[in-house]
Amino acid sequence: NPAATGRTPQLNIVGAIQTHAAGYEDAGSSMIAEADIALQLGKTRHGVGASFMNDEFGLFSHKRFSLMYAFHFKLFGGNMSIGASADMLNESVNGSKADLGDANDPAFPTTDLSGSKFDASAGIWFAHKKWYAGLAAQHLTAPTVLLGETNEMKVERTYNFICGYNITPKRSFFTLAPSAILRYDGTEFRADVTARLIYENERKRLYGGVTYSPQHSVTGFVGGTFHGVDRSY
């Protein structure tokens, strides 16, 4: 969500790698790297950032480079932000590795093809004392990327909603932080529900939890903040 750009006053750098169906050949992986920072210009607060994503699955590869901006302001006792991003998409297919029963089938390329297209995303974000929520739309232009002279790939608009709440009992070092992410691309719907338990005491911060996505996966994770760097597995 580009509206979340600059939501913290510190420079924020994020990197993550996820493998798909470990142990399977050409199962693919996803990687994202992102950096953003908040800027105070007079009495107004802004956020700027950049991100790069690479998603590979089988013969296909999807890359996106984004420049993000968000405008922040106070609203209803919380912090509201509106953001947008300019995106460059690159879609590619490794046709030279395709194992086809009919090598002359014109529906499948037999060489490596790639194509690029400009795109855009936008979103809103609201954070209160104990809860937050955001709504975003990706691929606003719903671009059709040309792959060579005879092939093309349609990129559908994607909508996502995120929300979360922090529950901290009085005089406790522990916080229970449930959250959810909902995604819809006009055809498929996916929900990821997470329960995270956080321990914070002075400069120590440790956490662990589980994420459940119906019909997709169950993921466990642990992590902590060490010398200002958040690491998780």
Q: Across the structure, where does each feature detected by a protein language model lie?
A:
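Subset of outer-membrane beta-barrel
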Residues: 1-233
